[in-house]
């Protein structure tokens, strides 16, 4: 039985679950781990809302199933969220990734945010949205933590393993963040979901290929600082992209994404939805953001993010050729 509390009284220890969420549904804010400290909502709004910042809507909520699911629902009834609307949560318990993957984290241990943008460029250029978002997140993580963050096409962020060890199918890097881009009803707005593992310990991580900023060796991590940097970098890159009509070459963004993309230059295998595997060397990104693989016979095949389930390295600590 859950005991009722008087307003203003702290939750008894037995009313707080191991995931940091109290039995009344709120997030426990008594953590002694600075990396799990609550987001400073007033500071976030002051820095990000216009006219100071790039956003028109910004809300920090305590708990939600999925920030993207919630933002998509809000877009159906309130168009004010449509361009420059940000929803971030202290804790989400039904986060979503590509191919229906579920992403859950302990309360206060991650950054979970969704940003609504109106691309305003030809639809065939929207394939760059997750890549540009990933570049922005990578730059934010580098500047705030010093970790060497890079992109794994099409939507993951990698950092070197703290101990330098390798994991099959991933090599000597670990996934620290992921991105999910979804088109909202009406087809004119895209919701960019961003999840960053911040403070999880190795024991709290779901798979050996995952890490967090703290587990990867970052010290003095502050979630509010990382959040502000992520939004600033992502919105700045998207503004450049839109200013050039979505032409990444004209904006110089194709070269910047390529320089940060760990996938390029390596031998990889791509698994298609029907289970078919395509192998080759990842040689470049084409005009719409597709990954171009060159086979042993010299032929090339572009792969669109929506047509691929997994991309894995081939070779040492990767798949066997």
Place the predicted regions along the sequence by residue:
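N-terminal lobe of the biotin/lipoate ligase/transferase fold
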Residues: 1-143, 163-170, 318-321
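Long, positively charged amphipathic alpha-helical accessory segments at protein N-termini or as interdomain linkers
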Residues: 2-10, 28-36, 123, 127, ...
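Short, basic and Ser/Thr-rich N-terminal targeting/leader segments
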Residues: 54, 81-83, 151-153, 276, ...
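Short beta-strand
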Residues: 60, 149-152
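Residue-level recognition of hydrophobic positions within alpha-helical transmembrane segments
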Residues: 64-66, 152, 229
């Amino acid at each position: 039985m859950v005991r009722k509390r008087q307003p203003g009284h702290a939750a008894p220890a037995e009313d707080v679950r191991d995931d940091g969420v109290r039995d009344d549904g709120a997030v426990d804010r008594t953590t002694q781990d600075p990396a799990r400290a609550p987001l400073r909502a007033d500071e976030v709004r002051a820095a990000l809302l216009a006219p100071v910042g790039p956003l028109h809507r910004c809300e920090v909520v305590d708990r939600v199933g999925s920030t993207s699911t919630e933002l998509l629902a809000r877009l159906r009834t309130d168009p004010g969220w449509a361009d420059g609307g940000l929803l971030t949560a202290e804790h989400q318990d039904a986060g979503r990734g590509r191919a229906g993957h579920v992403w859950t984290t302990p309360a206060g241990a991650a950054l979970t945010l969704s940003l609504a943008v109106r691309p305003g460029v030809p639809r065939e250029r929207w394939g760059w949205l997750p890549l540009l978002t990933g570049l922005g997140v990578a730059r934010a993580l580098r500047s705030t933590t010093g970790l060497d963050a890079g992109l794994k096409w099409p939507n993951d962020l990698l950092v070197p393993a703290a101990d330098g060890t390798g994991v099959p199918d991933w090599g000597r890097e670990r996934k620290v963040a992921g991105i999910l881009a979804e088109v909202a009803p009406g087809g004119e707005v895209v919701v960019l979901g961003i999840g960053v593992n911040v403070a999880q310990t190795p024991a709290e991580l779901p798979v050996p290929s995952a890490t967090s900023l703290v587990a990867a060796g970052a010290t003095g991590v502050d979630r509010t600082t990382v959040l502000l940097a992520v939004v600033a970098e992502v919105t700045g890159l998207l503004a450049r992209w839109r200013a050039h009509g979505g032409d990444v070459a004209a904006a110089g963004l194709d070269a910047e994404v390529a320089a940060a993309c760990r996938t390029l230059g390596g031998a990889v295998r791509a698994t298609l939805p029907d289970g078919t595997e395509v192998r080759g060397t990842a040689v470049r990104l084409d005009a719409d953001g597709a990954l171009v693989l060159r086979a042993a016979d010299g032929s090339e095949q572009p792969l669109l993010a929506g047509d691929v389930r997994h991309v894995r390295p081939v070779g040492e600590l990767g798949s066997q050729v």
